[in-house]
Regions:
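N-terminal strand-loop element at the rim of the active site
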Residues: 7-11, 23-68
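Extreme N-terminal starter segment of soluble prokaryotic enzymes
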Residues: 1-4
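An amphipathic, basic-hydrophobic alpha-helix
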Residues: 61-88, 97-98, 102, 132-136, ...
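Conserved alpha-helical elements of sugar-nucleotide-dependent glycosyltransferases
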Residues: 13-24, 133
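Alpha-helix capping/helix-boundary segments
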Residues: 40, 95-96, 154-156
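A short, histidine- and acid-enriched strand-loop-helix "catalytic/donor-clamping" loop
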Residues: 106, 114-131, 147
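A short, active-site helix/loop in glycosyltransferases that binds the activated sugar's phosphate group
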Residues: 144-168
Length: 168
């Protein structure tokens, strides 16, 4: 199976979980593509079935903040098409799940159908998720993901309390 993993590249929990999962999947014969703005800290070996794709963000004078989520979405569309990925697995709701859902919608217009799995890690729900500027996007991304997992039962319960989850 060809799997794209979107994650933060840092030593924080979600980046470590995503990287170790991807490494384990590659050891079992799957082809894994990590997609992020920097190589994940725990990804110290690239092999025949383990790849890293950097998301570069251009600075435009028009924007006060570089449009990372847009660049991430475009990069994901490119990789899904070129590498013929079977699955997208995202770790952390913002910006990874929202970028993957938009990429999925773009790819659908090109005749490419790809499932998105979202793994929730904690602060994406309990901290960022409560912020009114992020909550609708996270809610939408969770509801449009094909499968959703949480790193603990308490996080699953918090997610159900904070968001309007449909059929999950």
């Amino acid at each position: 199976m060809k799997i794209g993993i979107l994650c933060y590249p840092t030593f924080g929990g979600s980046g470590v979980v995503a990287t170790e999962l991807g490494k384990s999947l590659s050891e079992k014969g799957n082809i894994v593509h990590f997609i992020s703005y920097a190589q994940p800290a725990r990804l110290n070996l690239i092999s025949d079935n383990l790849f890293y794709h950097e998301v570069s963000v251009k600075n435009y004078p028009l924007f006060d903040f570089p449009p990372y989520e847009t660049s991430l979405t475009s990069k994901l569309v490119e990789i899904v098409k070129f590498e013929k990925l079977d699955l997208i697995h995202v770790h952390y709701a913002i910006p990874h799940a929202s970028a993957a859902i938009l990429a999925k919608e773009i790819l659908k217009t090109m005749g490419v159908h790809i499932p998105v799995i979202t793994t929730l890690h904690g602060t994406d729900i309990t901290l960022v998720g409560k912020d009114p500027s992020c909550k609708p996007v996270i809610n939408h991304s969770i509801n449009l993901s094909d499968k959703v997992s949480a790193v603990s039962k308490s996080l699953k319960d918090d997610t159900k309390k904070i968001f309007d989850i449909k059929n999950k």
